[in-house]
């Protein structure tokens, strides 16, 4: 595969160990009334898009076809995606393209910090594609971005949503601990039974260890994780994952509804009602999470500033 080849949908997942059942995927469940998304058409939305293009920046909002993009861009917030727009993994729920990435752009931290300063953002989320091709998984680039943002916008709070750094965990955590964020986020995404199907190349135990080891190295930094419902999990399995997260000292939690980006992606197996999401939120509170955001349209970085504020991060 040549660099910059963008594979999506069935082209991306063709080599996965567990194939998508296209016949089942074609039998789409009807979206319930509580799944509603605003069209992205505000002036602020266009302003944010223009600034991103001028500075050659990517957002996970666009690359992953997030349903909340109109609202978030309209509020002048975005989750910036560093290290390019090509992922080395092939997760069938995700709309980010797979391919052989280019080398990291050494000017990206500067461009990112400049854009954040121009937008006068008080809270930013920085995420990335998986970069299994890099010796540190991209951790140094995360640290460089954090450092550049703090230099230009010292008042801005920074949350990072990191990949799993599988096979590179020790060196990655060393680099991140030297320049830590205000919130450390790594999403488990789903239950361990579905990992081979939904997160090929990832490992449930390893992801928990990442969160635990970061907390051990930086105990004052809140840790956070997120889950999607509708991939084939049971309620009991979700509660088990919540218990595992608390056992690994994770402070904050998000749970949202999985929405299928295209017919070539993993099908939606169920739609969870707002009432059931509220039940998960109550369980999370009882388990001791400092903050839990659970709802159909909740995403890991959706209203992340409000989540952090409610968890006591100023």
Swiss-Prot record:
Pathway: Protein modification; protein lipoylation via endogenous pathway; protein N(6)-(lipoyl)lysine from octanoyl-[acyl-carrier-protein]: step 2/2. Belongs to the radical SAM superfamily. Lipoyl synthase family. It is found in: Cytoplasm. Keywords: 4Fe-4S, Cytoplasm, Iron, Iron-sulfur, Metal-binding, S-adenosyl-L-methionine, Transferase. The lineage of its organism: Bacteria, Pseudomonadati, Pseudomonadota, Betaproteobacteria, Nitrosomonadales. The keyword Thylakoid does not apply. Its cofactor is [4Fe-4S] cluster. [4Fe-4S] cluster 2 binds at residues 87, 91, 94. Binds 2 [4Fe-4S] clusters per subunit. One cluster is coordinated with 3 cysteines and an exchangeable S-adenosyl-L-methionine. This is Lipoyl synthase. Its EC number is 2.8.1.8. It catalyses: [[Fe-S] cluster scaffold protein carrying a second [4Fe-4S](2+) cluster] + N(6)-octanoyl-L-lysyl-[protein] + 2 oxidized [2Fe-2S]-[ferredoxin] + 2 S-adenosyl-L-methionine + 4 H(+) = [[Fe-S] cluster scaffold protein] + N(6)-[(R)-dihydrolipoyl]-L-lysyl-[protein] + 4 Fe(3+) + 2 hydrogen sulfide + 2 5'-deoxyadenosine + 2 L-methionine + 2 reduced [2Fe-2S]-[ferredoxin]. It comes from Nitrosomonas eutropha (strain DSM 101675 / C91 / Nm57). Its main location: cytoplasm. It is an enzyme of class 2 (transferase). InterPro entries: Aldolase_TIM (IPR013785), Elp3/MiaA/NifB-like_rSAM (IPR006638), LIAS_N (IPR031691), Lipoyl_synth (IPR003698), rSAM (IPR007197). [4Fe-4S] cluster 1 binds at residues 61, 66, 72, 301. It comes from the Bacteria. Residues 73-290 form the Radical SAM core domain. The keyword Lipid metabolism does not apply. One of its GO terms (molecular function) is lipoate synthase activity. GO terms for cellular component: cytoplasm.
């Amino acid at each position: 595969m040549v660099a910059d080849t963008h594979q999506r949908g069935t082209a991306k997942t063709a080599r996965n160990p567990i194939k998508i059942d296209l016949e089942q995927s074609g039998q789409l469940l009807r979206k319930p009334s509580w799944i509603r998304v605003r069209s992205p058409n505000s002036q602020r939305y266009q302003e944010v898009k223009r600034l991103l293009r001028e500075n050659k920046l990517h957002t996970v909002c666009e690359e992953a076809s997030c349903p909340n993009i109109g609202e978030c861009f309209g509020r002048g917030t975005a989750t910036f995606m560093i290290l390019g727009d090509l992922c080395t993994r092939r997760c069938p729920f995700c709309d980010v393209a797979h391919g052989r990435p280019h080398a990291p752009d050494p000017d990206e931290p500067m461009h990112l910090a400049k854009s954040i300063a121009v937008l006068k953002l008080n809270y930013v989320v920085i995420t990335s594609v998986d970069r299994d091709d890099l010796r540190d998984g991209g951790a140094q680039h995360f640290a460089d971005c954090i450092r550049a943002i703090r230099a230009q916008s010292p008042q801005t709070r920074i949350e990072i949503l990191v990949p799993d750094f599988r096979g590179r965990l020790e060196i990655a955590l060393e680099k991140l601990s030297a320049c830590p964020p205000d919130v450390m986020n790594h999403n488990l995404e789903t239950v361990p039974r579905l990992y081979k199907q939904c997160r090929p190349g990832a490992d449930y135990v390893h992801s928990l260890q990442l969160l635990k080891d970061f907390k051990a190295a930086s105990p004052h930094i809140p840790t956070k994780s997120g889950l999607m419902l509708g991939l084939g999990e049971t309620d009991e399995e979700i509660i088990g994952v919540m218990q595992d997260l608390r056992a690994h000292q994770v402070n904050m939690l998000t749970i949202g509804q999985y929405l299928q980006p295209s017919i070539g992606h993993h099908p939606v197996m169920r739609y969870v009602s707002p009432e059931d999401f509220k039940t998960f939120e109550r369980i999370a509170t009882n388990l001791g999470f400092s903050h839990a955001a659970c709802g159909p349209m909740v995403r890991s970085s959706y209203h992340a500033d409000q989540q952090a504020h409610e968890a006591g991060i100023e």
